[in-house]
Amino acid sequence: MESALPVVVIGAGPQGLAAAAHLVERDVPVVVLEAGTGPASAVAEWGHVRLFSEWPELIDAAGARILEPTGWAAPTTGYPTGAQWISGYLAPLATELGERVRYDARVVGVSRLGRDRLVDAGRGDQPFTVHVQQSDGEEYRLQARAVIDASGTWSS
């Protein structure tokens, strides 16, 4: 049963989207949970800042392979701003990942199914339970075989 569960990636920024792209290439089900309203919400907060890395260093190989069949062409030179990084790569990748990426989905907790501080036996054999809250206060839970925390340096 656990192999049918998705891997949950917390954060739809550069690292979260790259992790999702690698999982998609390996046919591993994945759900990306992003607290913000769009991809790379934290990057968008400093979108006017020019990055210290050139385009080739900012594009993950798996992400590029997913985008290339859509006609997307990787920028090859220059130092983009955060906004250019989003519009030129991160947003197209998130779009191509489609319904795997969920916005307005703040992760408020991660636990093991049926386990807590008092019930520890067999913890490693149980799937993860990811507790998610939306901005309207609605909450839901997802079960996952693994969780990748790519939530970044600060919350958006």
Go through each PLM region and give its residues:
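Extreme N-terminal leader/targeting segments of oxidoreductases
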Residues: 1-7, 25, 121, 138, ...
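N-terminal Rossmann-like FAD-binding beta1-loop-alpha1 element of flavoenzymes
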Residues: 4-32
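A secondary-structure boundary/capping signal
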Residues: 10-13, 35, 103, 144
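Conserved Rossmann-like nucleotide-cofactor binding loop
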Residues: 15, 38, 154
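Short glycine-/acidic-enriched loop or helix-start segments at secondary-structure transitions
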Residues: 19, 42, 112
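Short, glycine/charged-enriched secondary-structure capping and boundary segments
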Residues: 23, 45-49, 116-117
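Glycine-rich active-site loop/strand segments that organize a redox cofactor
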Residues: 36-88
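Feature captures the FAD/FMN-dependent oxidoreductase FAD-binding
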Residues: 73-155
